[in-house]
């Protein structure tokens, strides 16, 4: 997170999702993109894993499992919180590079930062298959050496 006094230099929300699918359009995640239109609650209709690293103005780092069954109900039913950190070592630091690794392999998905595994979740079948995406909110982020590898 770049913090040098720029317009979007805001220390918050290095968020990503993976294994994303739309249960209503299982063959095309993008079919309802216009309807979702960046509205956060409309993403509750997707099936995915989500990490909000340094979310809520850099006060939380959370791991959620969106189940794609949004019916207007409570968030904890649609996207249950699997784990949360609120301690300083698991929040964003200004102008620091991060090595983030997300794995979906051998019945498990993991999310690690700088070699520390923060989140682990057991999966079955094709549960880890799907799309990857970044969700950044009014911040300034630089990426280098971005890779997607299939094992």
Model-assigned labels for residue ranges:
Residues 1-151:
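Extracellular glycan-recognition regions
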């Amino acid at each position: 997170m770049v913090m040098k006094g720029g317009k979007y230099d805001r220390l918050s929300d290095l968020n990503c999702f993976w294994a994303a699918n739309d249960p209503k359009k299982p063959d095309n995640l993008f079919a309802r993109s216009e309807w979702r239109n960046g509205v956060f609650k409309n993403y509750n209709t997707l099936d995915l894993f989500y990490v909000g690293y340094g979310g809520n103005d850099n006060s939380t780092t959370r791991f959620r499992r969106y189940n794609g069954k949004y019916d207007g109900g409570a968030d904890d039913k649609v996207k249950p919180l699997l784990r949360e950190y609120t301690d300083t070592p698991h929040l964003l630091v200004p102008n620091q590079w991060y090595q983030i690794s997300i794995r979906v392999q051998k019945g498990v998905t993991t999310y690690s930062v700088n070699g520390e595994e923060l989140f682990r979740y057991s999966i079955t079948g094709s549960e880890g298959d799907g799309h990857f995406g970044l969700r950044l909110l009014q911040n300034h982020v630089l990426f280098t050496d971005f890779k997607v590898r299939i094992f």
